[in-house]
UniProtKB/Swiss-Prot annotation:
Lineage, opening ranks: Eukaryota, Metazoa, Chordata, Craniata, Vertebrata
Species per Swiss-Prot/TrEMBL record: Homo sapiens
Alphabetized UniProt keyword annotations: Carboxypeptidase, Cell projection, Cytoplasm, Cytoskeleton, Golgi apparatus, Hydrolase, Metal-binding, Metalloprotease, Protease, Zinc
Protein name per Swiss-Prot or TrEMBL: Cytosolic carboxypeptidase 6
Active site positions: 401 (proton donor/acceptor)
Protein's job: Metallocarboxypeptidase that mediates protein deglutamylation of tubulin and non-tubulin target proteins. Catalyzes the removal of polyglutamate side chains present on the gamma-carboxyl group of glutamate residues within the C-terminal tail of tubulin protein. Specifically cleaves tubulin long-side-chains, while it is not able to remove the branching point glutamate. Also catalyzes the removal of polyglutamate residues from the carboxy-terminus of non-tubulin proteins such as MYLK.
One Pfam assignment: Pepdidase_M14_N
Length: 503
């Protein structure tokens, strides 16, 4: 959750000394008590020593049940939400229950039907587990902390299975994406390195606009967008990519926006935290979104660099910083929505509500009713609050939140789980909304994004998919009663609002 605050007594589940966790597990083999010799098929091997991985400890409870401990953020034991690990050396038809036992938050979308993500080497596309096999409850065996348990059936012995809290989006993937954009040699796309993280990873800054807007002495209307200040909030990167993809496209709306506006985008403010698999903090254990007031060039170098640039633009008489949008993901609420500021100037406050209202009209997954405006003292160090107080009355600062789980279409009660594409679609709709805000509609007709033309072979494949039902993982073919009971699941019930998605 982007702007949520957890004081020490309310930090969530307790983690006692017996739960002390160091780094990630590395090819950790779980052997039965008293067993000697080489591991056999079915003796699971856990690993999280890879980019954005997180799993700190594994305890075998029984032949089929395992307690899994999230590794806390580096240098900060308070935050334990993100997990991302692999399991191999499985046996065909082996059924297991995994219990994530040390979440630092008590409130969770797991209560509403959210489920972990899974993929395997032979099925590399991420999918959500069936909600009917996921349980979220207070567990007496873990000091009545909240535990998330899920049942799973391994079906292919040669596969390596990967489980994650949400769709991963790594630093390396991000760099490859920017490299691919740079190779296109677009005269309206500019990439520069604004600075480096503590571990010397790049702080990329993108500028997307018509070259005419960058000529010396040209006046600029700037929209500044940041993302991934909290590394575990991976939907932020997908939304940001959707914004970028749309702005660099040849869509008529994108062409008009580039002529009228200058988009400055810093898509990954916390590259070290992303790489390390942290949920909220940087390498040194700082929540960067609480240090906008006085960021250190040594401790918070990426934040320091972005703040310096924004202040420099603010002081430039030729530059009008119109918008600042910081993109996050939310762990307890549905839909996309925004946080804004409260101002003494009533007219400015009312004008601030225009953009989210327009976005609500353009994006079915964005909720204006969930959008709120505040000046809570504990949020003073956030980008939204700090810049809202620094910039003048013509500037508007928002936190854009998007659910880790799903959105509810207006007029219905059904929860639609987010996909990578759905997150990126929200990003495209954010970009399109600037056309409405600046009333540029007469310049270009509002048209839907054209569908890509398919070759004959692709058309035939698509037709077959439409005629035949999708492949179902064996996990979905049997009733939930086939799975062994998890500790405490008899007392727990989950109100699942969405249909299960096949793996």
């Amino acid at each position: 959750m982007a702007e949520g605050s957890q004081s020490a007594p309310e930090a969530g589940n307790d983690m006692g000394n017996d739960d002390a966790i160091g780094g990630n597990v590395s090819k950790y083999i779980v052997l039965p008590t008293g067993y000697c010799g080489q591991p056999k098929k079915g003796h699971l091997i856990f690993d999280a020593c890879f980019e954005s991985g997180n799993l700190g400890r594994v305890d075998q409870v029984s032949e089929f049940e395992y307690d899994l401990f999230i590794r806390p953020d580096t240098c900060n034991p308070r935050f334990r939400v993100w997990f991302n690990f692999t399991v191999e050396n499985v046996k065909e038809s082996q059924r297991v229950i995994f219990n994530i036992v040390n979440f630092s938050k008590t409130k969770s979308l797991y209560r509403d039907g959210m489920a972990p993500m899974v993929k395997s080497t032979s099925r590399p596309k991420w999918q959500r587990l069936p909600p009917k096999n996921v349980y979220y409850y207070r567990c007496p065996d873990h000091r009545k902390n909240y535990v998330m348990s899920f049942a799973f059936c391994f079906d292919r012995e040669e596969d390596i299975y990967q489980f994650a809290y949400c769709y991963p989006y790594t630093y390396t993937r991000f760099q490859h994406y920017l490299d691919s954009l740079q190779k296109r040699n677009m005269d309206y796309f500019f990439r520069e390195q604004l600075g480096q993280s503590v571990q010397q990873r790049k702080l990329d800054l993108l500028t997307i606009t018509s070259p005419d807007n960058l000529r010396e002495g040209a006046e600029q209307k700037v929209v500044f967008i940041t993302g991934r200040v909290h590394p575990g909030e991976t939907p932020s990167s997908f939304v940001c990519q959707g914004i970028i993809d749309f702005l660099v496209s040849q869509h008529p709306i994108a062409c008009v926006l580039r002529e009228y506006l200058v988009f400055k985008i810093a898509p990954m403010l916390n590259p070290d935290g992303v790489y390390l698999g942290n949920y909220r903090c940087s390498l040194m254990g700082f929540d960067l979104n609480r240090h906008w007031l006085d960021p250190s060039p040594w401790v918070h170098p990426t934040l320091h660099g972005v703040k310096q640039l924004i202040v420099q633009m603010y002081n430039d008489p030729k530059t009008s910083l119109e918008f600042y949008i910081d993109i996050h993901a939310h762990s307890t609420m549905m839909n996309g929505f925004m946080y804004g500021n409260i101002f003494e100037d009533e007219e400015r406050f009312q004008r601030q509500a225009i953009f989210p209202k327009l976005l609500c009209q353009n994006a079915e997954d964005f909720s204006y009713s969930s959008t709120s405006f505040n000046r809570d003292a504990v949020k003073a160090g956030t980008g939204r609050r700090f810049l809202g107080g620094l910039l003048d009355h013509t500037s508007y600062c928002y936190t854009l939140e998007v659910s880790f789980y799903s959105y509810i279409i207006s007029g219905t009660t059904a929860a639609v789980p987010y996909t990578e594409e759905a997150y990126m679609k929200l990003g495209r709709n954010v970009a399109r909304t600037f056309l409405d805000y600046y009333r540029l509609n007469p310049v270009v007709e509002k048209v839907a994004i054209p569908m890509p033309r398919l070759r004959n072979k692709e058309i035939e494949v698509q037709r077959r998919k439409e005629k035949s039902p999708p492949y179902k993982h064996p996990l979905l073919r049997g009733p939930a009663s086939n799975y062994p009971n998890s500790k405490g699941d008899k007392k727990s019930s989950v109100n699942h609002k969405d249909p299960s998605t096949p793996f």
